[in-house]
Amino acid sequence: MNNRLKLHSIPALLLKPKSLSKMWVASAAFFTIAVLLVSFKTPSVKAGPQTDNDLNESKIQLGLAIAPVPLNFEHRNKRLVGLGSYIVNAQADCNGCHSRGPSTEYLGPGNPYLLSPPHGPFGGMQEVNIATYLGGGRDFGPFGSHSELLHLYSRNLTPDKTGRAAGGLTYEQFLTILRTGKDYDHIHPNCTGTPDGNCLLPPFNGDVLQVMPWPVQQHMSDNDIRAIYEYLSAIPCIDTNIAGAPVLRNNCN
């Protein structure tokens, strides 16, 4: 009798291990479902950098702000012009090569490469020389080893009277240049006889632009190249007149 009473006084769970296992499984399942429900209801938190749209918008606005020359937006996509300005002026330093060199790239005390008395090293605002901005004419010669040394000049990137960039190039031509380096002017062909100071000796290829970093630029996206073209179409025309480099002349009227 006492044994029966003691037996009945023991908790039922101790007498039913299978029931205990079922309760643990049920509890675990309930906890898992609760966690999943909470995770679905909890808003996701964005981490990392801005979205591509945010970054592009920032570049567009900055590009429009730093353009050193007045821009012509007529019949042009202003957003592409802004993005193109950012690439040309803040990333690629196109004017560093496509002007006449450091001595004329900037004006007076606005030249960061020169001392700016009485304050010593440059500490003020840069002032780009708009008279030479992207007008080409930087001499990368002498180039080659023959007696008549060749001088290579950076090309004029400003639009002509048609409003097309780089002296009247179509976008398709401009795209081809940046993708392949093709020289549409073909002003320095390969030498076929005695070097005359204008032709290129092997192994250099007279069909492509030398010095220009098109092997790097060819990896740019179509949209970025289009933006550069749009910007170069919006800047003022410059007629660069340098003896021995008629290719730099531009019909602005």
Residue ranges, per PLM feature:
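Bacterial Sec-dependent signal peptides at the C-terminal "C-region" and cleavage site
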Residues: 38-47
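Electrostatic cytochrome c docking/interface patches
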Residues: 59-89
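Bacterial N-terminal signal peptides
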Residues: 28-37
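Extended intrinsically disordered, low-complexity coil regions enriched in Ser, Thr, Gly, Ala
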Residues: 170-173, 183-207, 241-243, 248
